[in-house]
Structures are given as C-alpha cells and as structure tokens.
C-alpha cells in the first residue's frame, strides 16, 4: 500500500520556541555540504525519509524502527492560527501535531488552548519539551537526546534538575489535564501515554529523537489515514490567497489526498457556495539555488500528488476564503466534487443565536475555533462570517445593541477593519475587539461583559425610585400649597427631585419639585442627615394632611421595591436598606399583605 507523508503541525505558547524548533527541523541535513535534504513546498517543508534515517541512524536500531512512510510534510506556519485555519472534513488537516512547551516555564494559557483544540479535533500529538539547553548545568549538544542522557555526559546535579523540570513543568500538567505522559524512552504503550521528547531548538539536541518518534507514531497509528489514493482526484485546503506578479490572484494550498494535473478543474468553496475554475498552472517553488530572479520563483508541474503544498493559478479567484475545502478534478467529475465541497462548507456553518454579538475571522477554521471558545464562556453569537469588518457589520451591531447593550460588540480575529467601518464605529456605541490570539480575545470579551453588566446594573439602579424617609422640620413651613414649601431632614435614604411622596397612612401627597442647599442653590438630591428646603407639588396642604414633625416616605412602586429588595439590595447603602425595610413594613401593614414587595 502506497503511503503519503503525514502532515505535521507545530503548536504551543508564545515564546516557547515554535518557530525556532520549526527552523531547526527545516534545516535538518546530514552534513552542511549535503545538497537538498529538505524540499520546500508551498506553505510546507518535506523532510524525506532518507534524511530522517540518516540523522537518526543510531536511534532506529535502538528503537527497532522500520520507517516506510515517504517522509514528513511539516506545515511552515506554526501556532493555533495555522492549525485551526487548515481544516478538512472530519477535523484538522494535520495528521499529527508537535506541542512545544518550554520545560523551564511550564504550561501557559496558550498551551492549554492548544491542547483543547487538539482534543476537539481528535489530533494525536507528542510534546517537545524545548529549551533543554537552559536546564542548569546541562551539557547540550547537537544530536540524539537519548545518547546524551547519561551520567557520562551529564553532571548528576544536572540530571536531577532535568528530571524535576520535566515532571513539574510538563508531565504533571499533562496529568492534571487527564493525560498519561512520560519521557519517550520510558513509554511502554504509546496508545495510552503521551511521548515527551526533550529538545533544544538552539543546539539541535533531541531533533533526531523527535523526528523518529513522530514518524514512527504516524506510521503505526495512521496507516489507513495515510493510504494514498493513487487513482483518485486531489483533495485539499486553501492556505491563503496571494497576488503574484505576472500570475494575478493565486491560491496556496495543501493537498492531502489524490492526484492533480494541469488542465483539471479547481472546485473550491467561497461565500457564494462553490467556484469552478479551469487550472492554468500547478506551481512548485524552485530550489533556493535556482531563485536568482525573484520574479521567477516558481516552476510548473504537470502532475502533483499528496501530501504536498502547491500554488494554483486559475481565473476568478477573488472571493476564495482561506481554510476553504478544494478539489482538483477532470471535467467529468466536477458535479461530484461540487457536492463534496458544498457538504464540507455546510459542516463549517456555525449555528447562530436569535440575538448576540458579531464575530469575524480570516479563515473558516479560525472562525470555528473562535466560536467554539466563545461558546465555552456562554457568549451568544448572532452573526459569524469570514472577512473584513465592514460598515454594514457596525450598523447591524448597533441595531442589536438597541435591544440589549451586550449585543453591541464585534470580535475580529486577524481581519482588517475597512475605513468606512472605522468611521461608523467612532460615531456609534459599538465596541470592537481585535486580536490574533483566541484566548486573549475571549478574556477581553469576558472583561467587557463584566464592565457592561456593572454599567447596566448601575443604570438600572439609577432608573429605579430610591427609598427615603424625611421629617418636616418644626417652624419651617414657608408655604402651605401649590407648591408647598418647607424645611425637611432626610432621615434615611436619598431624596431626589421627582420623588413621589406619601404620608404614614399611605395617602399620596405629590412629588418633590425643587431641593435647595443652604446657599439657596438648586440641587438634584439630598442625602441622609441633610436639612434642606423643598417644594412639593400635588395634593399636599401643609398644616392639614401634612404637619410639622410628620414622617413622609418616598413612594416606591411594588415592582421596583421587589427589584431593590431581591436584586440590588447589596448595592444599597445601609441607610437606604433601612429606608426600604421600613417602607416595605409600612406598605405591608397598609395593604394588609405580608408579601407586599417580597
């Protein structure tokens, strides 16, 4: 059975050495003078099995490994972004992943996010415990780790420190996340235990071990998945859309199954459904020593087979989206391919809610990953699309906010904000969160929701009628009615302009028209302990239905009293709580209803 190269993706936290490790893997060769070694594809690097065998010859005998895969195809762009963007039906495009962890720092938020994404996509992975050279006292040198891991080459203190860091910073965290894990040389059952391979992207130590372990695991457990369909048409995923001088818009893609030929038809997903376009050229990069003229970087291929990276030149590619599924087929297979691609596009469709926020991302896979992480924190999503932020998006978000301020948000993952959208945001109440790291965007979303809920709570409290008790001061009646003017003391709560007043027997007296301070300046409210002159408009006639030393209450409608009592009691000051309690007791007595306000 013919096997294709396993597709390998590299994930991990920022600054834990993903790019350095990838660079080290890509530069793998037997000697500096050896030509080639690594074949550079579009968007990926192929490490031939012969190169792996040569750099790992001492290990293959040790592990009794007989590698039959043609090599490894390592995706050039590290990180979650690339991993989530590169999807195919049934999960991730990558067959297997390398999770990079700084063995001196341990797990970080993005490490955990990477593991969650790998679990979600059911992608097997090994752990590269990087920065081995920074373990105190460790004598790190290029070559296999396993041949350097002994007391002949390492000081006993360095060996002890290594074991502590390996366990405390890597294995223990994996255990806490529900994985059995161990140093790769101690793993007895690879179906149950995660292999941890110590490496140094700086010195190159452990790179041969890493290549052997990942090749062996891929061959052993993914054989059916790696079976090459030598007769079938090509299946792949769009990496990105690129403008190339002399070619116009081109697609960079990873082909994971089948064979493609020049003159075949490209069938690819786009926002309108499916695009069909006749292929003008299938292009591969020239070797570095051929790249003398940057305008002449590519060479045409009559035929390509999986797994490979390829640049596709064809007409009408403007609306193709990164992460879209594609097929390359002869004319008589176009309809079958269209049905397949449509089905895959529909599987990427994100279920939306009746109300919620807008999310935008640069690729279908990224959009799906962002939506999944937001769902975990109970976010409601009204609209989820691939593409730049437009003025229309902002107008829609503004209309969503009119019914619920928590809906007035756009989250943008790795997309541009068009100039007219920026202008619209500046004059609207819409919040925009932008970023390139999903977990940070989710954290920012949670912080924004918390702030908005506090603001909304504050606004709602301010709209409610606040409880207060006041006493009419003796010798301070200045006018009996229309409006009545007198001096009062605020006993409990806050007296505000517009507050409705009632007597102790429940009679409506009117509402507070004006409050003045001691300098006779108008003020909006008087707090507990203040003595102020007030004017009261309504039924009140001082000396008849309200007299000196009488206690008056701000009349709080029952639904508002209930809200204050149940939802906002903790937000009230002590004197406001007292005013509310006394008012509710009075109303329960007047209404002969012990449940009033409860």
UniProtKB/Swiss-Prot annotation:
Which PROSITE patterns does this one have? G_TR_2
Q: Which Pfam families match?
A: GTP_EFTU, GTP_EFTU_D4, IF-2
InterPro entries linked to this entry: EFTU-type, P-loop_NTPase, Small_GTP-bd, T_Tr_GTP-bd_dom, TF_aIF-2_arc, TIF_IF2, TIF_IF2_dom3, TIF_IF2_dom3_sf
Q: Per UniProt, which keywords does this protein have?
A: GTP-binding, Initiation factor, Nucleotide-binding, Protein biosynthesis
Q: Which Gene3D superfamilies match?
A: P-loop containing nucleotide triphosphate hydrolases, Translation factors, Translation initiation factor IF- 2, domain 3
Q: Where is this region: G4?
A: 130-133
The molecular function terms of the Gene Ontology recorded here are: GTP binding; GTPase activity; translation initiation factor activity
Region (G3) spans which residues? 76-79
| tr-type G domain span | 3-225
Give the residue ranges for region: G2: 37-41
Q: What does this protein do?
A: Function in general translation initiation by promoting the binding of the formylmethionine-tRNA to ribosomes. Seems to function along with eIF-2.
Checking NCBIfam families in the record gives: aIF-2, PRK04004.1, PRK14845.1, small_GTP
Protein name, per record: Probable translation initiation factor IF-2
Species for this entry: Methanococcus maripaludis (strain C6 / ATCC BAA-1332)
Question: Which lineage is the organism of this entry classified under, starting from the top rank?
Answer: Archaea, Methanobacteriati, Methanobacteriota, Methanomada group, Methanococci
